[in-house]
């Protein structure tokens, strides 16, 4: 059985950035859960999405707009379970850039990849495939994340 936050995240699939001078109010709501509190939907928002989803369950997220902030949240787990917060490197494993989303399982089309439900994946909430070699860590809530 998937954790509650996966059900919440799945209901957000399809929310996307608005091109031009307007902003998607839902993405701005995601941003409101971080200290950055960005005012535009073009500002990277993968961590904001994870913070928002986690907050909907009554847990406390990182409050950071940085994807890599999740590497210090909860407890690390060696083997991912559905719903595990998954932190992925972007430019290089040592860069500060990253991506974060929720682990859904192995990619059925390529066993060297995983499926991640996340925000700001091609400017929308979606399910995307990532190479497992790019995973920096899988995280799970601990008692410290209770609000």
Q: Which sequence ranges carry the predicted segments?
A:
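Intrinsically disordered, low-complexity, charged/polar segments
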Residues: 127-147
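A residue-level signal for beta-strand positions that form part of recognition/binding surfaces
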Residues: 6, 113-114, 135
């Amino acid at each position: 059985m998937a954790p509650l936050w996966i059900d919440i995240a799945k209901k957000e699939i399809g929310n996307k950035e608005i091109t031009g001078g307007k902003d998607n109010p839902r993405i701005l709501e995601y941003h409101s859960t971080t200290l950055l509190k960005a005012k535009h939907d073009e500002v990277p928002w993968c961590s904001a999405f994870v913070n928002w989803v986690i907050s909907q369950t009554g847990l406390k997220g990182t409050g950071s707009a940085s994807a890599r902030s999740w590497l210090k949240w909860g407890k690390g787990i060696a083997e991912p379970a559905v719903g595990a917060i998954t932190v992925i490197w972007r430019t290089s494993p040592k860069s500060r850039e990253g991506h974060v989303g929720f682990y859904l399982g192995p990619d059925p089309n390529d066993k060297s990849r995983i499926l991640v439900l996340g925000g700001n994946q091609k400017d929308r909430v979606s399910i995307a495939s990532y190479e497992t070699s790019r995973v920096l860590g899988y995280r799970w809530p601990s008692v410290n994340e209770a609000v």
